[in-house]
Amino acid sequence: MRRIISALLLVPFLAGCASDPQDPGLQPADAEPELVQMLVLTSAGGTVSPAAYFVEDRKEMNAYVKTFEDRDDVAAAVQQAVKDAGDREGRLAAATVAIGCDVPEGVSITEGEDRPEVRADKITNPKQECFAPTTSIAVVEIP
């Protein structure tokens, strides 16, 4: 009987020894930049560039869409992607990562001198030809 009572008294004590979520030493690692959405637009034009533009900033968004032939469609697609992303901790940015027949499956995101840089992952099985070139725009979250 004493063993059962001792065990019952020990359980709440051990539960009280759980980690403290307010302890800064136990917080999750710093957030990493991540791909939020890959937009694929047919015949949008543009230029592949690793420079990422913060699309929630009106000036940056305007500077980004100026590089496209079909500015209105690109602006609408990027704005919809921002809306679809919902509330996020970091800032959303866009970069044109590929133009051609293939859509990259992922991207790598690094810190550049002036702004984040986004580069397409290597295409593992490229298509030889396509009906119309597509422009791949990576929308990424930068913590």
Across the structure, where does each feature detected by a protein language model lie?
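C-terminal motif of bacterial Sec signal peptides marking the signal peptidase cleavage site
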Residues: 13-16
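Mature extracytoplasmic domains of secretory-pathway proteins
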Residues: 54, 58-113
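A generic, residue-level signal for flexible/boundary positions that often mark functional hotspots
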Residues: 8-11, 124
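Extracytosolic low-complexity repeat regions of secreted or lipid-anchored proteins
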Residues: 91-143
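Bacterial signal peptide processing site
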Residues: 18-21
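Post-signal peptide N-terminal segment of mature Sec-exported envelope proteins
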Residues: 25-46
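N-terminal export and membrane-targeting signals
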Residues: 1-9
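Flexible, solvent-exposed extracytoplasmic
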Residues: 47-51
